[in-house]
Swiss-Prot record:
GO terms for molecular function: 3'-5' exonuclease activity; DNA binding; DNA-directed DNA polymerase activity. It comes from the Bacteria. The gene is dnaN. InterPro entries: DNA_clamp_sf (IPR046938), DNA_polIII_beta (IPR001001), DNA_polIII_beta_C (IPR022635), DNA_polIII_beta_cen (IPR022637), DNA_polIII_beta_N (IPR022634). GO terms for biological process: DNA strand elongation involved in DNA replication. CDD domains: beta_clamp (cd00140). Belongs to the beta sliding clamp family. The keyword Kinase does not apply. One of its GO terms (cellular component) is DNA polymerase III complex. Confers DNA tethering and processivity to DNA polymerases and other proteins. Acts as a clamp, forming a ring around DNA (a reaction catalyzed by the clamp-loading complex) which diffuses in an ATP-independent manner freely and bidirectionally along dsDNA. Initially characterized for its ability to contact the catalytic subunit of DNA polymerase III (Pol III), a complex, multichain enzyme responsible for most of the replicative synthesis in bacteria; Pol III exhibits 3'-5' exonuclease proofreading activity. This is Beta sliding clamp. It comes from Buchnera aphidicola subsp. Rhopalosiphum padi.
């Protein structure tokens, strides 16, 4: 095995995938990168057993095919301290990887590529294409509502499903729910999967690139996404996701229309004196007035009032102020619309003139 590559290209691709490297005393190969070269393509692979990243680079110089694994951190630290435009030569000799560049030479230990756990075979039941900026936005609109180390393991991820010719992303921790829709241009096979939260966060990071068309393959227990020259694969969470549609409001009457900026500033002021543990605030709404009240364990209080558009009956509710702020931070319109359900147990929030995103927050008992 032998190849030559420009250093800045190698470093750029190493940076994309080395976040997955983990220290594992019982499985040390997880600290390594799988390096494989064949058919003019250099593949760099990392995995944490749940997520796998493969970066592919076209090699334009002479090479000898082969595969091996070396320390990911060490090769990245070596190369990032070499001249950007210099050529890095990497031949494999007697189970040692030699790295040479200008006047610098290194010899690295290796582990067999045959012991590296990777998803070589991938059988899919559905596949489709979607713009990276659309998927990125769908993730951003919902990921904050995912469960965090919940015993209901299926909540610790994001639901992604095809339904009624729409792609839907849904996240809930049992106290709040976020949903985002995107219309699919072509009909595809039905699927409904739960992507683990760590994989969702990693995918969101990878989508911080120029807008491009993604190729997404859905497997029975994993999902694979082609992001230009990068391949993202993750295992899925098994289990049945809650019936989120039963939570969405069937009837939306007496809308409460509030300016996003005014509401956010009012909530931030009230949050200063909210209870540190429960984070609850009181909201009173009546005839174009929105009043926010908070108090805490030290018997301190805050009250804030601003104008809204509402002519219905008086409403008094309690809500987690930070759940509400999370929603507002993800709404870009000038105004937002709030609806209260009949049982007064939850509110549904939407952006004005945008029905592709919706948020449900359970109310606190007063």
């Amino acid at each position: 095995m032998k190849f030559t590559i420009q250093n800045d290209i190698l470093v750029e691709n190493l940076k994309k995938i080395t976040r997955l490297l983990i220290k594992n005393v019982s499985f040390p190969i997880l600290e390594n990168i799988l390096i494989q070269i064949e058919n003019g393509i250099l593949s760099l692979t990392t995995t944490n057993l749940e997520i796998e990243l493969v970066s592919k680079i076209k090699i334009i110089t002479k090479y000898t095919p082969g595969k091996i694994t070396i320390s990911g951190r060490k090769i990245l630290n070596i190369c990032r301290n070499l001249s950007e435009k210099s050529e890095v030569k990497m031949p494999l000799k007697e189970k040692k990887m030699y790295v040479s560049c200008e006047n610098s030479n290194y010899i690295l230990s290796t582990l067999s590529a045959d012991d590296f756990p990777n998803h070589q075979n991938f059988n899919h039941i559905s596949n489709f294409h979607i713009s990276s900026n659309i998927l990125k936005e769908m993730i951003e609109k919902t990921e904050f509502s995912m469960g965090k180390q919940d015993v209901r393991y299926y909540l610790n991820g994001m639901l992604l499903e095809k339904k009624d010719n729409f792609l839907r992303s849904v996240a809930t921790d049992g106290y709040r729910l976020a949903i985002s829709y995107s219309k699919l241009e072509k009909d595809i096979n039905f699927f409904s999967i739960i992507i683990p939260s760590k994989a969702v966060m990693e995918l969101s990071r990878l989508l911080n690139t120029q807008v491009q068309l993604l190729n997404i393959l859905i497997g029975t227990n994993s999902i694979r996404i082609y992001i230009k020259d990068l391949i993202f694969t993750t295992q899925l969470i098994e289990g049945e996701y809650p019936d989120y549609e039963s939570v969405l409001f069937k009837e939306k009457k007496n809308p409460i229309i509030a300016n996003c900026t005014l509401l956010k500033k009012s909530l931030l002021r009230a949050a200063i004196l909210a209870h540190e543990k429960f984070c609850g605030i009181e909201i009173k709404i009546e005839k174009n007035k929105f009043k926010v009240l908070s108090d805490n364990q030290e018997e301190e209080t805050a009250e804030d009032l601003f104008d809204i558009n509402y002519l219905g009956d008086t409403i008094e509710i309690s809500i987690n102020v930070y759940y509400l702020l999370d929603v507002i931070n993800n709404i870009k319109s000038e105004n937002i619309i709030l609806f209260l359900n009949k049982s007064k147990s939850s509110i549904q929030i939407e952006a004005e003139n945008n029905s592709l995103n919706a948020y449900i927050i359970m109310l606190l008992k007063r």
